[in-house]
A protein has these predicted regions:
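Beta1-alpha1 glycine-rich phosphate/pyrophosphate-binding loop at the start
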Residues: 4-72, 152-177
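Residue-level detector of alpha-helix initiation sites
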Residues: 12-13, 36, 110-112, 148-150, ...
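FAD-site-proximal beta/loop scaffold in flavoenzymes
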Residues: 24, 121-136, 230-279, 286-289, ...
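A Rossmann-like FAD-binding core segment of flavoenzymes
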Residues: 69-93, 98-100, 160-256, 296-300
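Glycine/small-residue-rich loop that forms an oxyanion/phosphate-binding "nest" at active or ligand-binding sites
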Residues: 76-136
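Glycine-rich dinucleotide-binding loop and its adjacent helix/turn
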Residues: 110-149, 153-155, 159-161, 254-256
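Internal hydrophobic alpha-helix adjacent to the cofactor/substrate pocket in enzyme cavities
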Residues: 156, 163-164, 283-301
Length: 301
C-alpha cells in the first residue's frame, strides 16, 4: 500500500493547483481524478477572466495546469475514489487500489443539476457540454436551458454550428454577464423563451422536442428540437466527505478561508467548500491555500 504526504481528490483547477504548491513545498503528492483532468473548465470554449491570459480555451488551460503538476513530480491518476477513511493516516480506496496519506485535500468540485424529467437519463439528445457534443447538431435546431454564464456561452458556441438556438430561462432576466446577453441578442439564429420551463421531453429514445410552460401566463407550447443542452446549475460533489467531515444544508463542506475542515488533516478546496464566490481564480486560490495548510499539518505530526 503506497503512502503519500498529501492525497488530493479531484483534478480540477483547485486540485491541480494544490498539487503544484504541495510539490513545490517538497511533499509527495497523489492526485486522483475520476473523469478528466481540468474539471468542468476543460469543456469551456473560451476562458477570458483568468489573470494574465486574454483568451484561452478551457482545454488548453487544463493542459497547462496538468503539465505543470506532472513536471513537478505529482502522481496524477485517473481513478475513481470509492471511499475515504479517517485515522492517523487517511485511507483512500479507489477502483484500482488503496492508498494512505498524512493529509487529504478534498477538491471534488460540483456536478450538473438536472431538470428531473422522465427520460432525461436515457434519451439521446440530452447534453451538458456544448463544446463536447455541439458538432453532432450542426445545421439542426437545438435548445439551451439556463440563465447563467454557462448557458449563455453554450448558446453562443452553438449558434455558430446550429440552424437555430432557443434559450429557455425560467426567469424574466438572465443572471449571466450582460456582455454575453448582448452578443446573443445580435445573433439572427437565436431566440429566447423567458419565464419558461421545460415540462416534458418529447420523443421515444431520441429527443424530438420539448413541452414548455410559461410561468406567468400558464400557456403551454411545444418546441421541435434535436438537442437540449442543460445548464441549470450545479450541486456539490461531497458524498465522499461524509465519513470525514459534515456538510452544510446545501451539501457544501464548511471551512474558513484557511480551507481547514473540522476533521484533523482534512482540507477542502474549490467549489465543493462553503463560500460566497465560485470562480476559476478562487478555485486556484483555494488550491494554493489548502496545499500550504496541508504542508503545515504534515510538519506538525
Amino acid at each position: 500500500m503506497e503512502h503519500f504526504d498529501i492525497a488530493i481528490v479531484g483534478g480540477g483547477p483547485a486540485g491541480l493547483t494544490a498539487a503544484i504548491y504541495a510539490r513545490r513545498a517538497g511533499r509527495s503528492v497523489l492526485l486522483l481524478e475520476k473523469e478528466g483532468f481540468g474539471g468542468q473548465i476543460a469543456s469551456s470554449p473560451r476562458v477570458e477572466n483568468f489573470p494574465g491570459l486574454m483568451s484561452v480555451s478551457g482545454a488548453e488551460l487544463a493542459d497547462r495546469l496538468y503539465n505543470q503538476a506532472e513536471a513537478l513530480g505529482a502522481r496524477l491518476e485517473l481513478e475513481e475514489v470509492l471511499e475515504v477513511r479517517d485515522g492517523p493516516c487517511k485511507t483512500v480506496i479507489t477502483d484500482y487500489g488503496t492508498y494512505t496519506c498524512s493529509a487529504l485535500i478534498l477538491a471534488t468540485g460540483m456536478k450538473h443539476r438536472t431538470l428531473g424529467l422522465p427520460g432525461e437519463d436515457t434519451m439521446a439528445g440530452i447534453s451538458f457540454c456544448a463544446v463536447c457534443d455541439g458538432s453532432f447538431y450542426q445545421g439542426k435546431d437545438v435548445a439551451v436551458c439556463g440563465g447563467g454564464n454557462t448557458a449563455l456561452q453554450d448558446a453562443l458556441f452553438l449558434a455558430d454550428l446550429c440552424r437555430h438556438v432557443t434559450v429557455i430561462h425560467r426567469r424574466s432576466a438572465f443572471r449571466g454577464d450582460p456582455v454575453l446577453v448582448q452578443a446573443l441578442q445580435k445573433r439572427t439564429n437565436v431566440s429566447f423563451a423567458m419565464d419558461t420551463v421545460v415540462t416534458a421531453l418529447l420523443g421515444g429514445g431520441v429527443l424530438t422536442g420539448l413541452s414548455l410552460r410559461n410561468t406567468v401566463t400558464g400557456a403551454e407550447t411545444s418546441l421541435a428540437v434535436s438537442g437540449l443542452f442543460e445548464a441549470v446549475g450545479q450541486l456539490p460533489e461531497t458524498s465522499l466527505s461524509a465519513a470525514l467531515t459534515p456538510v452544510d444544508a446545501g451539501g457544501f463542506i464548511p471551512c474558513g478561508e484557511d480551507c481547514v475542515t473540522s476533521a484533523a488533516g482534512v482540507f477542502a478546496a474549490g467549489d465543493c467548500r462553503a463560500k460566497e464566490v465560485r470562480q476559476l481564480t478562487t478555485a486556484c486560490a483555494d488550491g494554493a491555500v489548502a496545499a500550504l495548510a496541508a504542508c503545515n499539518y504534515c510538519k506538525c505530526i
